[in-house]
Design a protein with these regions (language model features):
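Collagenous Gly-X-Y triple-helix signature in extracellular proteins
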Residues: 1-189, 194, 200
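Short, charge-rich amphipathic interface segments used for partner binding and complex assembly
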Residues: 203-214
Length: 215
């Protein structure tokens, strides 16, 4: 794991937009963090789709939830786009990948960074990983930390948002010295992000239209 030049380390906890987050991975100028607790309970998808890219939970996290953080004072420029590998738990790569500003942890990431993730002995919570494209199950983390499955339509699943944050802005924000920059927003990336979600929702091969998320 790369050391962060702004001093953030795994297991560091801080509050942004009224939500407590814990660092699980560091890069030189960014940190990946997960909500320290479940922020709410909701279905992965009301239509029982287990493809994160097409899901209601994905739309919620990158829409209403992100707007709520920003409205509570979190700098919008702090949230980086990052890739999510949507390989299913059975190894099938039907769902490809996705690119988001707020996501959910995958099963592979959970295994890799488990020691940095606060345990929740009273809640179970969704991952972004489908059990298989041939069913409607989504993998989730149980109260004892093991991985199980539930239907995507299950409304009792906990939500622990995952973010990649620019650590320079994060440090300034936490110290109270952040001032919004006047640099123009990347409207093209936002538009592509929206179109990819629409394509996934309508079962269009987004990779053929926009290219792979990891390119």
């Amino acid at each position: 794991m790369t050391a962060n030049k702004h001093g953030f380390e795994p297991k560091t906890e801080f509050t942004i937009g009224g939500i407590a987050f814990t660092v699980i991975q560091t890069g030189e100028d960014w940190v990946k963090c997960i909500a320290s607790e479940c922020v709410e309970e909701r279905a992965f998808d009301a239509k029982n789709r287990n493809d994160f890219a097409a899901s209601d939970i994905r739309a919620y996290l990158n829409g209403e939830f992100l707007r709520r953080l920003i409205a509570a004072g979190a700098p919008e420029e702090m949230f980086e786009y990052f890739n999510i590998d949507l390989t299913a738990d059975d190894g099938l790569k039907t769902y490809g990948g996705d690119r988001v500003r707020v996501g959910l942890i995958t099963c592979e990431e959970y295994r890799l960074f488990r020691e940095h993730i606060p345990a929740l002995p009273n809640d179970w919570w969704w991952t972004a990983t489908a059990d298989s494209p041939i069913n409607s199950f989504v993998r989730y983390v149980s109260t004892d930390g093991t991985l199980y499955v539930s239907y995507a339509i299950d409304g009792g699943g906990g939500v622990r948002p995952l973010c990649n944050l620019k650590s320079e802005i994060l440090k300034s924000y936490l110290s109270g010295g952040y001032e919004k920059q006047d640099a123009p927003e990347d409207q093209r990336e936002k538009a592509v992000d929206m179109m990819k979600h629409i394509a996934a929702a309508w079962d269009i091969d987004a990779e053929e239209v926009f290219g792979r998320a990891d390119e």
